[in-house]
Amino acid sequence: MEKLNIIFAGTPDFAAKHLSALINSEHNVIAVYTQPDRPAGRGKRLTASAVKELAMEQQIPVYQPANFKEVDSTKQLAALNADLMIVVAYGLLLPQLVLGIPRLGCLNVHGSLLPRWRGAAPIQRAIWAGDTETGVTIMQMDEGLDTGDMLAKVSCPIERDETSASLYEKLALQAPDVLVDTINKLVKGELKAEKQDPQLACYAKKLSKSEALIDWSKDAVFIERCIRAFNPWPVSYFVLDDKVIKVRQAGLLATKSEQTAGTIITASKNGIQVATGEGIINLEVLQLAGKKALPVQDILNSRRELFAQGTLLQQG
């Protein structure tokens, strides 16, 4: 089988797992593209991405252009003379000129079963919408937003208690092997590309912090899905006594309430029950400002007065 010279473009840990699989494959990773180092942590020190750290460990050349608008960035990539470029959660837009540089084009690993959930936040939006299944699609990139021909798919169930964090981990275990298998089939001429049906497309817009503010007038089922979808970021929250309180985990109760949405019905070691537009949600793990996340029972031991019965929480 022909060994390909591959450029890899990616940034977070999810992408690094794919880079690791490529490094351990029969192919050659000749260069890595990743986003510029960013300030992180309380000290705001410049921090390398997970992909850059792995590439440096493996002594693979790393390139970190701010964008591909400059001619020099494009020339630099072309000079690598790669057979194929793999893009996984890179975070930068690639112009059509770049997509056409590698001999076999560019492949993208996308965290949904396309054409459902094209866009920036497919994993989070799938949970947010109440989908029972998602997966990963390997596609040939074109100039559109996740509109390229599909080369491989693998599905993954979304469990009842799934968070974005846990779903990322599941997909990160599945997808790298599928990527390597797809590349091998591409080399052997065994792939059959499938066009996307635009009629089935929907879009996963980027998450915003403003979305994470809980709107208690929504039904409990929807709010609970949002809490799982926004974990680990941006984390659902509400405001009480001008304090931001993040909700890390919640459950649903079968009972109904006639109370105004956002009213605390009761607070006990089993959770803080809050009335919603329809149904009751039980807040189980909270994070007070500047503190670590704790079970409600532990928080009530020291801050019970915050969660008195009848307290009305601020609406989103």
From Swiss-Prot:
Pfam families: Formyl_trans_C, Formyl_trans_N. It comes from Psychromonas ingrahamii (strain DSM 17664 / CCUG 51855 / 37). HAMAP family: Formyl_trans. The keyword Transmembrane helix does not apply. One of its GO terms (cellular component) is cytosol. Gene3D superfamilies: Formyl transferase, C-terminal domain, Formyl transferase, N-terminal domain. This is Methionyl-tRNA formyltransferase. It catalyses: L-methionyl-tRNA(fMet) + (6R)-10-formyltetrahydrofolate = N-formyl-L-methionyl-tRNA(fMet) + (6S)-5,6,7,8-tetrahydrofolate + H(+). Its EC number is 2.1.2.9. PROSITE patterns: GART. GO terms for molecular function: methionyl-tRNA formyltransferase activity. SUPFAM superfamilies: FMT C-terminal domain-like, Formyltransferase. Attaches a formyl group to the free amino group of methionyl-tRNA(fMet). The formyl group appears to play a dual role in the initiator identity of N-formylmethionyl-tRNA by promoting its recognition by IF2 and preventing the misappropriation of this tRNA by the elongation apparatus. (6S)-5,6,7,8-tetrahydrofolate binds at S112, L113, L114, P115. Keywords: Protein biosynthesis, Transferase. Belongs to the Fmt family. InterPro entries: Fmt, Formyl_trans_C, Formyl_trans_C_sf, Formyl_transf_N, Formyl_transf_N_sf, Formyl_transferase-like_C_sf, GART_AS, Met-tRNA-FMT_C.
